[in-house]
Amino acid sequence: MSHISVLLFETVESLLADRTTGVYIDATFGRGGHTRLLLSKLDENARVYAFDKDPQALEVAAALAQEDPRFTIIHASFADIKEKMQEIGVQSVDGIMADLGVSSPQLDQAERGFSFMQDGPLDMRMDNSKGLTAAEWLLEVEEEDLANIIYQYGEERYSRRIARAIKQAGKLDTTAQLAEIVKTAHPKWEKHKHPATRTFQAIRIAINKELDDIEVFLPQAVDLLKPKGRLSVISFHSLEDRLIKQFIQKESTLAEDSGWGMPQQQVDTRRLKKISRVRASEEEVKANPRSRSAWLRVAERLEQKGA
């Protein structure tokens, strides 16, 4: 299956807000669908920078950089976005977009170890040049910690019995082995959902530190945005969406009075204005079922107070 970018036009249009030039960042290049559309809307003076840590994504990005001198790829996690941009002399940008989660090619390639639908080595690393594989991590993690991770990151109600079964199995080498253990341990299957779905999601999030990276990325992204610059982020599950929602809420709400019952003037620390929250259309969901769970949240950088 080729990768189909989710909420493609909605994301790029929300990012540009009718602009045709400027400096932009795609924080999750993937296979470049959003970046290519963005470049097609921009004039010759614009610049687009993209981040990714997946070696296969970097190959696609390197080819695009050869085709289009306005584009630069940076081999790094978006959690390092501010530091990496400052290293190349970019202090502020007009827009930042991110498409979170695993891309279709990663899921479809058995050797990447993300999918329970195809047998492959139990890997799951976004950047397979460093860090523990899922197989190595499962050997090291304590049963109680594993149960908590499956519960928190997979929102799996049977996390304890699944964690117990995984740890009792000992060394696991393939995705099929893990999927079968989870399937056997799971007492109640959800309609239209493989019983290993939530557990695989939880392990992937844990070994790639996905939620940690999002929490680090969001405030840095706002730091980089110019006034009226846009932040457009696509999430695919409730954990990601909750983080983004809470962050935008916090950055767009007046701080509560903490005057211990005494009158105190509120300080306006708001940095963002909510713009929109968008779901994929029925037509897009039919064409690309993966888009069913996707949410796009858009916010705009406010003018700096006292500037």
From Swiss-Prot:
Pfam families: Methyltransf_5. It is found in: Cytoplasm. S-adenosyl-L-methionine binds at G32, G33, H34, D52, F78, D99, Q106. It catalyses: cytidine(1402) in 16S rRNA + S-adenosyl-L-methionine = N(4)-methylcytidine(1402) in 16S rRNA + S-adenosyl-L-homocysteine + H(+). Coiled coil: none annotated. The keyword S-adenosyl-L-methionine applies. InterPro entries: RsmH (IPR002903), SAM-dep_MeTrfase_MraW_recog (IPR023397), SAM-dependent_MTases_sf (IPR029063). It comes from the Bacteria. GO terms for cellular component: cytoplasm. Its main location: cytoplasm. Keywords: Cytoplasm, Methyltransferase, rRNA processing, S-adenosyl-L-methionine, Transferase. GO terms for biological process: rRNA base methylation. The keyword Cell membrane does not apply. One of its GO terms (molecular function) is rRNA (cytosine-N4-)-methyltransferase activity. Its EC number is 2.1.1.199. Belongs to the methyltransferase superfamily. RsmH family. Specifically methylates the N4 position of cytidine in position 1402 (C1402) of 16S rRNA. This is Ribosomal RNA small subunit methyltransferase H.
